[in-house]
A protein has these predicted regions:
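A Zn2+-metalloprotease active-site environment signal
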Residues: 1-171
Length: 171
């Protein structure tokens, strides 16, 4: 996020807020995400970027004697139900560790272009790779370690751990 903010001239905290999303709430009546191959340009691009991250992380995990379990890409519009609860477009892209799925509202790409002046493939790929970073943190147990540390920490330290977690997901 920091590098992206420097590249685009945006406030890093504002970008963290948008990319990190908000809290999902459970709503059993929420629309379910469509399944199958994406048919629009943004969806096809997202699937291609995700496939590229799968290739890279599979190789990195293999070099460590482990196997990589890729997340599932879920494309949605307006709202979606996940194992982490229901999320609206306002949440932005998010990774749900409970179902190991990466949720992406394709309208978010338009928001990147219009609100943050970050149109194009780089910004879109960056967001997808960031969410995959959260998946890797979950697979390696880092997310659980950070959550445990946050529960023992004061508010300022817990927030600092959140920022570090977001920055690591960028890597």
């Amino acid at each position: 996020v920091l590098l992206f903010a420097l590249f685009t001239g945006q406030d890093p905290q504002q970008l963290l807020d948008v990319i990190g999303g908000g809290q999902a709430t459970v709503d059993p009546n929420a629309p379910q995400a469509p399944t199958g191959a994406p048919s629009d340009e943004h969806g096809q691009f997202a699937a291609t970027v995700l496939a590229s991250t799968e290739d890279a992380w599979s190789e990195i995990f293999r070099a460590q004697g482990q196997s990589y379990r890729a997340p599932t890409l879920v494309l949605f519009t307006d709202a979606v139900a996940s194992a982490c609860g229901t999320a609206s477009s306002a949440v932005g892209p998010f990774y749900c560790p409970a179902d190991q799925k990466l949720y992406l509202d394709l309208g978010f790409f338009d928001l990147l272009a219009q609100r943050f002046g970050a149109p194009g493939d780089f910004a879109q790929a960056y967001v997808i790779a960031h969410e995959v970073g959260h998946h890797v943190q979950q697979l390696l147990g880092i997310a659980d370690q950070v959550t445990a540390a946050q529960q023992r920490a004061g508010e300022a330290q817990a927030n600092a751990l959140s920022v570090r977690m977001e920055l690591q997901a960028d890597c």
